[in-house]
């Protein structure tokens, strides 16, 4: 069983990363949705220092931007209150034009893995929305348009620049968002080969219905299938997420394909030192379903108890095995 923690301000010191590796953690994920690989050099250097100190070949996965939809950069967090009107696009919250063009009146718009929700009222160069579920919106948070598919390139210009820097920063794997076809993975492999990085492991994220349903067509083109429950839950609806995870697990088992489960495994531990019983059962059952890897995100990136979260993840996985 492989286990990963997401890098962030809460854990990115060489001594702390060394402690996590000594506990048995396999490696780390670096989320590039909010930043660039070059800007994260202090963090990747901390990983390399931890590798040397622990004597363990810790994996370093970079999670690419890819075709996923995201809010632009905000000067400061924006509170959204249920019932209020907000504008997306010119004169309002920064959203890319192709996203705005895909929105029709009545469209539900989910933000930050569904934590907040809007309903589109009128559409044009800008989209006027009503907040249906409030919260505090931060820069670069995810946008989901349930039922809408946008055609975007597998790799952005920034992704290609990040791959240019990968060899010099100890990267061992890439995680490709919103995989829906074999062609997208072939594009990733070609980009890696052009940089002499064909040895890097490719994690392919399933984040919508199309990616889930087309899994048999592209499964063998990646190294590890990733059940990315944040956007997958937003796109399918939470009630359909358990069936999707079970089905993906069964397909991977039959094909002998390794798969990873990620998102809110121990979410409570972002703020509390122990998980809930439901979280313990969730992780335990993921192992019983055949998961070959588990990954923490906010629990270690920004949580108050990163060491305890990793310890719980390791203990639950070992107990299940």
Residue ranges of predicted features:
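Non-catalytic helical/linker scaffolds that mediate oligomerization, partner binding
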Residues: 1-321
């Amino acid at each position: 069983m492989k286990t990963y923690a997401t890098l962030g301000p809460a854990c990115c010191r060489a001594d702390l990363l060394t402690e996590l590796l000594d506990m048995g953690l396999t490696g780390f994920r670096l989320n590039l949705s909010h930043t660039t690989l070059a800007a994260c050099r202090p963090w990747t250097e901390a990983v390399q220092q931890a590798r040397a100190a622990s004597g363990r070949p810790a994996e370093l996965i970079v999670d690419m931007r890819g075709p996923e939809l995201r809010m632009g950069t905000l000067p400061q967090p924006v509170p959204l209150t249920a019932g209020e009107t907000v504008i997306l696009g010119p004169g309002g919250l920064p959203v890319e034009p192709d996203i705005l063009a895909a929105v029709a009146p009545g469209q539900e718009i989910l933000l930050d893995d569904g934590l907040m929700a809007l309903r589109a009222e009128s559409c044009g160069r800008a989209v006027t929305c009503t907040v249906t579920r409030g919260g505090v919106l931060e820069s670069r948070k995810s946008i989901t348009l349930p039922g809408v598919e946008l055609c975007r390139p597998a790799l952005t210009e920034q992704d290609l620049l990040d791959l240019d820097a990968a060899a010099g920063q100890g990267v061992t794997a890439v995680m490709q968002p919103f995989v829906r076809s074999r062609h997208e993975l072939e594009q990733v492999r070609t980009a890696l080969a052009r940089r002499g990085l064909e040895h890097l492991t490719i994690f392919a994220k399933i984040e919508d219905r199309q990616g889930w349903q087309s899994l048999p067509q592209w499964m063998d083109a990646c190294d590890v299938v990733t059940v990315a429950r944040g956007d997958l839950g937003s796109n399918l609806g939470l009630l359909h997420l358990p069936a999707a995870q079970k089905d993906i697990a069964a397909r991977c088992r039959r094909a002998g394909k390794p798969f990873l489960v990620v998102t809110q495994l121990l979410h409570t531990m972002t703020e509390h030192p122990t998980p809930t019983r439901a979280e313990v059962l969730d992780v335990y059952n993921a192992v019983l379903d055949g998961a070959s890897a588990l990954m923490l995100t906010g629990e270690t990136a920004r949580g108050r108890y990163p060491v305890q979260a990793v310890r719980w993840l390791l203990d639950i996985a070992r107990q299940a095995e």
